[in-house]
């Protein structure tokens, strides 16, 4: 199992390119199953989850053609099985996204429950109830969701999401694209990745309006045609590198990104004392060698502050001037990284869904362990400005969401290297 060794204390400086968004690429890949011809998806990030989705397609009889320019061509007409097996689904919760497209296009699907996810848990329940509202008959047995469309296919429906669910919105929107009649999704997720998926579906001929608001209207069509589409930039990767620049007092320009989808994060970075300038597809952050000021953060669904940037801002507050509160309203148990940061000397107190962080001038390098994707990013950020060496174990979490992280940080001057476990 690979590890990262980071020698801290280097001020980051330079330019990097931002990769395509994993959280957009995965549903877009799933949506290719709706098409009755070949589809090309460009700007895919080279990440483990993307590889797993492509492997899932291969297991189903589809043979994606990948080129060196980060694009893939998928022709779903060669599909031979409508089963998404557990050995693949367990490694990637987003594989539930093939459920809606398969039922809508092929009339049935058998998808393993995502690993560690009981049926009573709200996110999976929303996917199932949304499809049932469209007429699907669904059984959950043996750890699999078995879904069958009614005779004549799925029917348009009005569906209200009890809680805002990004993947739930995406799954039902994809299914509705080929359903008979109109579907209206209320309390829908507003995330940019949902908008990107809607734009991809529209490029294939879907009739969708309202994406980016809490009410999405879909008028089902008989078929979706071939298209070529470029995945949006990754806003969380963008934010992560900007925070890394801020904690090291550095200057970093991120290119091939979109400032308009990261406004809540950029405002907090300005509040922390960063000079932030933007163009149509770039953001530059300059700390001028200063130590950041502590900021208060409260996570909430888009367009508010994203939960996927919470851990990074705990790392920022850990070395900032003053004390900042970070309130997590989206997920439980999302402060696992705090206990690893304690090993580096961070002063953090967790009270329920709130982390109170008192900044300290210097963190000390230490052996730490990544517990999940975004927590691992917070450890990298803290290691970049810590005194001495930090060894980060279980970095497969990082590889799920950050393309070539050590190479990109090396381009900015960081002393970071990957070593085999």
From Swiss-Prot:
One of its GO terms (cellular component) is cytoplasm. Belongs to the EPSP synthase family. MurA subfamily. GO terms for molecular function: UDP-N-acetylglucosamine 1-carboxyvinyltransferase activity. Coiled coil: none annotated. SUPFAM superfamilies: EPT/RTPC-like. It comes from Pseudomonas fluorescens (strain ATCC BAA-477 / NRRL B-23932 / Pf-5). Signal peptide: none annotated. UDP-N-acetyl-alpha-D-glucosamine binds at residues 93, 122-126, 308, 330. Its EC number is 2.5.1.7. It is found in: Cytoplasm. The active site is at residue 117. CDD domains: UdpNAET. It is an enzyme of class 2 (transferase). InterPro entries: Enolpyruvate_Tfrase_dom (IPR001986), Enolpyruvate_Tfrase_sf (IPR036968), MurA_subfamily (IPR050068), RNA3'P_cycl/enolpyr_Trfase_a/b (IPR013792), UDP_GlcNAc_COvinyl_MurA (IPR005750). Cell wall formation. Adds enolpyruvyl to UDP-N-acetylglucosamine. GO terms for biological process: cell division; cell wall organization; peptidoglycan biosynthetic process; regulation of cell shape; UDP-N-acetylgalactosamine biosynthetic process. The modification 2-(S-cysteinyl)pyruvic acid O-phosphothioketal is found at residue 117. Keywords: Cell cycle, Cell division, Cell shape, Cell wall biogenesis/degradation, Cytoplasm, Peptidoglycan synthesis, Pyruvate, Transferase. Phosphoenolpyruvate binds at residues 22-23. Pathway: Cell wall biogenesis; peptidoglycan biosynthesis. This is UDP-N-acetylglucosamine 1-carboxyvinyltransferase. It catalyses: phosphoenolpyruvate + UDP-N-acetyl-alpha-D-glucosamine = UDP-N-acetyl-3-O-(1-carboxyvinyl)-alpha-D-glucosamine + phosphate.
